[in-house]
Amino acid sequence: MYCLQWLLPVLLIPKPLNPALWFSHSMFMGFYLLSFLLERKPCTICALVFLAALFLICYSCWGNCFLYHCSDSPLPESAHDPGVVGT
């Protein structure tokens, strides 16, 4: 379970508020996970635990899934603020 300490913080990285950055964020996270899995070769148990946690987060649509944005969940209130989006 040593390799899990490098995978679990990835789930805590928040998505950007600006919807224009969601694609680049998901590409970065996908490439990071792919390079991590190829370089470190985590054990099967750690990989399964991480994939189960990722599936549960994305399936529940909490809004922190980096693979896609759930259509049911609205944008945060600060996403409509031009001061935040314009930065």
UniProtKB/Swiss-Prot annotation:
Membrane-crossing segments per the record: 19-39, 43-63
Its membrane topology: Multi-pass membrane protein
One BP annotation, GO: apoptotic nuclear changes
Family matches, as InterPro entries: BCALP (IPR009598)
Tissue spec. comment: Cervical tissues (at protein level). Urothelium (at protein level). Endothelial cells of urinary bladder vessels (at protein level). Urinary bladder stromal cells (at protein level). Cervical tissues. Kidney. Ubiquitous.
Effect of residue 2 to C: In RNA edited version
Cellular component GO terms held in the UniProt record: cytoplasm; membrane; nucleus
Protein name, entry field: Apoptosis inducing factor BLCAP
Native species: Homo sapiens
Source lineage: Eukaryota, Metazoa, Chordata, Craniata, Vertebrata
